[in-house]
A protein has these predicted regions:
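Conserved structural position at the C-terminal beta-strand
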Residues: 10-12
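C-terminal edge beta-strand
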Residues: 19-30
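Conserved beta-propeller blade signature
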Residues: 36-40, 87-91, 144-147, 183-186, ...
Length: 352
């Protein structure tokens, strides 16, 4: 699977440790297979850095994929990942120093790597020292990297190393941003903030009239917007004009974003999936307006009691990915990642 390292370590009779490292190349597609999946682990604020998992189309798992390819680690409490132009941008909450001042040996707050080899291309830490617990990232190009934190959304020019807080972005929610029509869309209450290249002020706002839970790019280049409340709604919004194309009322679930920081809806063509951090997975067919409960993941593994962050659907295979943990305390170390197939009237487990 691409480029890696072979390590041989031994100890002599005097207790001295010897380590030999060889870089090796294995014929294959590396991490470029579009059927593969990356999963970002935040790690733990007090004990370990974040890490990246890669799962290939056969369900084989490579833990610590970034560390394997670089010999170094991602930042402390990694939060979000965005891939643009064969580059992977990974933002962490704490970078090299956690919230209580403990230092960590890692590559910093923002890491840029080749998305097909995972080889590190650039790292940033001091340049982003003004950020306060960053959580999400979206990228238009190297000079227009948008990072959401507790202050709002910042524009970062990685070529110049300059970060600027975007005026009018205060209150941007701890939720995934979407990129469509060459713009970034961030959530702030009932409004979408429209962020544009090179602009340090919010370009315009789109008022949906109801608390927004999630925004995601549709396969036709427009936007999916879910709204929580009673009734809950899902709308398709024109990414060029900001006008609603169609809005469906959803009565079966409330579409609440909950405590998850990811995108609470996930789309495959005109079908949208939602779990609400629970074990049941729902499908909303936007064309027909019908919502169906596909199944309960507890039927596959009852030992895992909590869904940790929202589900995600693979844009090519249509398979649904859900992460479940055994519980809090040290039980968070015991987890299962489910790969599921929508059979039309239920769920089929592909890999666990």
């Amino acid at each position: 699977m691409g480029l890696g390292e072979l390590r041989l370590q031994g100890t002599d009779e005097n207790g001295l440790v010897y380590l030999a490292i060889a870089r090796v190349s294995v014929k294959g597609s590396g991490f470029a297979d579009p059927a593969g999946v990356f999963i970002l682990n935040e790690g733990n604020m007090t004990t370990e850095n974040g890490s990246l998992i890669y799962i290939d189309k056969e369900g084989k798992v490579l833990d610590y994929a970034y560390r394997t390819m670089n010999g170094t680690e991602l930042g402390n409490v990694t939060q979000d990942i965005y891939i643009f132009n064969k580059k992977m941008y990974i933002i962490s909450q704490n970078g090299k120093t956690n919230a209580v001042g403990t230092g960590f040996d890692n590559d910093g707050m923002l890491v840029v790597a080749n998305s097909e080899t995972l080889v590190k291309e650039a790292t940033f830490n001091e340049e982003l020292s003004a950020l306060n617990w960053p959580t999400h990232i979206a990228v238009l190009d190297e000079k227009n990297i948008f990072i959401r934190d507790n202050y709002g959304v910042h524009l970062f020019d990685s070529e110049a190393g300059i970060e600027t807080l975007i005026e009018g972005s205060k209150g941007a929610g701890k939720l995934t941003m979407a990129v469509a029509d060459g713009k970034v869309f961030a959530i702030a209450g009932s409004k979408l903030l429209v962020l544009e290249k090179g602009k340090t002020t919010v370009g315009k706002t789109i008022d949906m009239g109801q608390q927004i839970a999630a925004v995601a790019k549709a396969n036709d280049g427009n936007l999916w917007v879910s709204m929580q409340g009673s009734p809950a709604k899902i709308a398709k919004v024109n990414s060029k004009t900001g006008e609603s194309i169609k809005t469906n009322v959803v009565t079966e679930v409330n579409l609440n974003a909950g405590a998850g920081a990811g995108c609470s809806i996930t789309a495959y063509q005109n079908k949208l999936y939602y779990s609400g951090l629970g074990s049941k997975i729902y499908r909303h067919d936007f064309e027909t307006g019908t919502t169906t409960m596909l199944g309960d993941v507890k039927e596959f593994n009852s030992e895992m009691t909590m869904t940790y962050n929202p589900i995600a659907v693979h844009p090519i295979t249509g398979h649904i990915y859900m992460n479940r943990i055994k519980g809090y305390g040290w039980n968070f170390l015991i987890n299962s990642i489910f790969e599921l197939e929508d059979t039309g009237n239920g769920l089929k487990i592909v890999h666990e």
